[in-house]
Amino acid sequence: MKEIVLASSSPRRRDLLKQLGLTFRIMTAGVDETPPGGLTPAEMVEVLAGRKAAAVAGMLEDALVIGADTVVVLNGRVLGKPADREEAAGMLRQLQGTDHTVYTGVAVMDAASKKMQVAHEKTRVFFKSLDEHEIRRYVATGEPMGKAGAYAVQGRAAAFIKGLEGCYTNVVGLPLARLADMLKKFGYNVL
């Protein structure tokens, strides 16, 4: 079977791939993560996932490269990763007491043939109401930094989640069922 390469330095994506029992290595490439204008959130994450996979695949002769990108969307506005703690707190103030949608784009590219599959998953997340003290304490943990929407569903923010509609691993950053189906189309069975 072909080597699997994860085009991401995300510890969460690494851990999710390990859950599938896959043997893989991690490689990243400097990719412009500025999406072209005028795209829907689904199109945006697919484009960025494809860029990441293609950039790493271009450095390899023969491997299946996985790229991914995740955003949180609230009332039509995309919330990416917060730049600082104040922005993280602001995002959490917006998300508290509402529901929002998490989109993750996934791309799998065969470095040898240059064939690529791109897809996305979306999950609806319901947040409970939070007070300012809870938001400040959570931000002080540092956990919101580097995460779309300023929260980690698999971490302390699990206490904020009332429910989900859709794929849990999508909210973590990599929809495993979707990825397994994509890999299968390249002849790679995870089981």
UniProtKB/Swiss-Prot annotation:
GO terms for cellular component: cytoplasm. Nucleoside triphosphate pyrophosphatase that hydrolyzes dTTP and UTP. May have a dual role in cell division arrest and in preventing the incorporation of modified nucleotides into cellular nucleic acids. This is dTTP/UTP pyrophosphatase. Its cofactor is a divalent metal cation. It is an enzyme of class 3 (hydrolase). Its EC number is 3.6.1.9. Pfam families: Maf. Belongs to the Maf family. YhdE subfamily.
